[in-house]
Amino acid sequence: MNIFEIQQSKQDKEFVMKNGSLEFEVFADILKTADDIPYIGSLFKLSKVAVNYMDYRFVRKLHFFLVESENIEPERKEKFLNSLDEKDYKRINAMMTHLLYSAGEDGKATLMGKIYRSRLLGEIDDEMMLRLCSVVNRAFLADLEHLEEYVKPNPEDNYITSNLYSFGLLRLKGPEVVERTLNVGGQYEVNEVGRLLMRIMRE
């Protein structure tokens, strides 16, 4: 499956945008008429007895992902795709498809869509797009809402802090030598990657 080709295919994109947010049962009925849609039609083997629920979930997440860049000019999307050589095109498409397919929540697809939009607008580069989407894929979405609490150095050290730190969104402002000896002190503060994600989340 190629999310870039789906984005560029008028038939596929229209199908995803129109039907991707439907409930499974309704979607399964509509899909019976989708055999002429190039990429989505091939994803769902229509000869199967039942629609694969995971594939349905992928199309649903793809809907929320694409919604975020719907208002971006086609020229910007073309410019982004044309900037990729064959190797990077395959690598980035494979990673983005995997991250989107394995995302556990629709909200993650929405946030990945916002990250992709930032890339199309030239606000971040390819590697930062992949880094941020990878963080979103692995994170518990509600934890990301707590990033604002670390704009200023925060001594709080709980499971949310641990999660955000492990995802590379916080930096530890180390304690003084005496405090390290006593195993106390130290404050967490959002780093550059975390600030980028915060900004994108606000959009």
Placement of each model-derived feature along the sequence:
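Membrane-proximal, non-transmembrane interface segments of integral membrane proteins
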Residues: 55-124
